[in-house]
Amino acid sequence: MTKQDYMDEAEQVLFHVYNRFPVVFDHGEGVYLYDTDGKDYLDFASGIGVMAFGYGNRDYNDALTKQIGKILHTSNLYYHPPLVEAGKKLTRVSQMDKAFFTNSGAEAIEGAIKVAKKYAYLRDGHAGHEVIAMEHSFHGRTVGALSVTGTDHYREPFYPLMDGVKFATFNDLDSVKQQVTTATCAILLEPLQGEGGIYPATKEFLEGLRQLCDEKDILLIFDEIQCGMGRTGAMYTWQHYGVKPDIMTTAKALGGGVPVGAFLVTNRVAEASLVPGDHGTTYGGNPFVCAAVSKSIDLMEELQLPEHVQQVTPYFEEALAQLTKEYEFILGTAAWASCKDF
């Protein structure tokens, strides 16, 4: 089949919800993708932040092949070694206490919201609690995740969304405080806004949120789906600030290309929120994806990817600054690890 044949047949059988580029990729190796004609492309997108250690890594491929030969899937009603190993490694590098594996970042957000609502339900003895999210944020495309996404053009066609959501101005503590009521159960934000324009939270803002949440018994949720897994020079962005959340979500590079996400909580939250029957998943945390998570974390550490980000940041800052001088339409630049408020 020719490239055009693939594209034509795709339009016949696939729901047209992506404006795809006219290229058909066949395989990848290192930082390059190769199309069906053999042409190579330097992959600056990394599969939208997923392929942190590139394509065709032999250790990663061997680990997944080995797991396929053992067992791909079993119910979450049973234990299996890859689940335990992945959980141990993820809680260690995230500095959180308990993990729940999901199939995507959006599912992780949904789970985080449920944890916060159940925590408040047990605390107050009734439902009807609210979440404060940030303007210009992005948390996913499921109805719940979209409800806490502060970008109107994503939300508007799907009203009414989940109620009990208020929006505050990012990096404006007073704006958040104005939205807090006795019904507030959580404050949700990205420590480094991605879709909103690569905007880092200030240290003062995160410290103020932490203090506010502690005073009001509100749970602080950090969405690290896009900015986590080494992209800012630490495994998770909040670790730069030293402001620990009560709940954290992660995905993207977590599985090295395999669909997986997770939400993590502190022991305090785990002991006062979800119980058996409150939440679950068929595929989340199965042996195959957990083998991928475990090997991805291993490679992150073996290849010292967070440290590498720190090393190459000055080069990118200089190169990006030069582009602003050469092209008038570039108003400014931002890099994941060049945020000076840490």
Residue ranges and their predicted role:
Residues 1-342:
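Conserved N-terminal phosphate-binding loop of PLP-dependent enzymes in the Aspartate aminotransferase
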